[in-house]
Amino acid sequence: MGNEVRVRYAPSPTGHLHIGNARTALFNYLFARSQGGKFIIRIEDTDQKRNVEGGEESQLRHLQWLGIDWDESIDKDGGYGPYRQSERNDIYKKYYDELLEKDLAYKCYCTAEELEEEREAQIARSEMPRYSGKCSHLSKEEEDKLIAEGREPSIRFRVPKGEIIKFDDMVKGEISFETDGIGDFVIVKKDGTPTYNFAVAVDDHLMKMTHILRGEDHISNTPKQIMIFNAFGWDVPLFGHMTLIVNENRKKLSKRDESIIQFIEQYKNLGYLPEALFNFIALLGWSPVGEEELFTKEQFIDIFDVNRLSKSPALFDMHKLKWVNNQYVKALDLDQVVALTLPHLQKAGKVSEQLSDEKNTWVRKLIALYHEQLSYGAEIVELTELFFKEQIEYNQEAKEVLAEEQVPEVMASFAGQLERLESFTPDEIKAAIKAVQKETGHKGKKLFMPIRVAVTGQTHGPELPQSIELLGKETVLNRIKQI
């Protein structure tokens, strides 16, 4: 094995880029870049029934959107291709034929029904279900008879008996498996397709992978892959298994869990920033030295240390993601925030596709008003709802504010001040509120809260004079009259 670090992300094109797969890609990418090595993307598409049209293209496009680039893949030949497993069948055949020739593998003619019966009988005896080895030493006559019955064989790897497979996991430390607990496993299906564990081991060797960094759900695959490496006398790469991502209930993140958005494309469509999502995902199961949590991609590459991958499950905290994204949104200039948010206002039918100069100025002021508190692009629709409503509804907290005894006096004074304004600007509105204070003697919350609630329906919000300006004199006076 050479000195250059070579790692891979190996997706199956079975759908869009999931947050968990994005994390696997991102950590492999950071590890390769931090070590001056190569990051390879290999498409594991042997299970044609599960492949989704457009799945491959979607995954690669959204990795690029996140800021993850690669050195070798289907679009960048580094001399170790093909990079799609479905195009490597001749390569796999050469290696499983070699195992058959050396009697390190054998043909198995058991039917699915026979295997299921065997499994059920083992469970009934409280035994660990595994293949009994029924076909492991067939005579030529027995094999000919099974072939004459029209049976199609699979190929099984002959698991060595009485051995212990040990590896030093980069995340979890030493892990060991007894081979006696692993039955002879299928490496080629009856239709001639290599299984996952066989194809992966062959590819990782031929593509000169030095480190395999993946989710802990692959731990049980590792001894099988190591046995295949050993059978050929190949160097075994270093393995590291990252902990699961869990939701707020500490349950494994499941694609069926609809309370959490789980696909990168959905975050992109909602107006999350790729740099922020990269930052957030990089902290899912990895931590830097110190308290800082916001880093550029280049900074992550400089500080990434595989030894700081967490041994505990990574909590997917939606509030944290919104906070991280908000920090990045706050760093944008107004033109960038408008580009991020305006399409969402247009899609929601709040503003038209073609804006007059006057309307464009109004929209830019509206977006600027919420710039600091915006968590993601699409949130602008919800935040600005009060500017597009004819009628506003008051919740219980708002009703309690409006029921205070000073409110009629404050509202009457404020309406009078607004009607006298010739110029409806934030400065003039601020002066009008001060005049109400002088006229009524009410100040602080007794003054500002009723005005805010009356015109916005909310007890909290952005700068009040700017909000009143954008609502417009007519709307504000109508709302005051309605209470």
From Swiss-Prot:
Binds 1 zinc ion per subunit. One of its GO terms (molecular function) is ATP binding. One of its GO terms (cellular component) is cytosol. It holds the Pfam family tRNA-synt_1c. A motif ('HIGH' region) lies at residues 11-21. Signal peptide: none annotated. This is Glutamate--tRNA ligase. It comes from Bacillus pumilus (strain SAFR-032). The lineage of its organism: Bacteria, Bacillati, Bacillota, Bacilli, Bacillales.
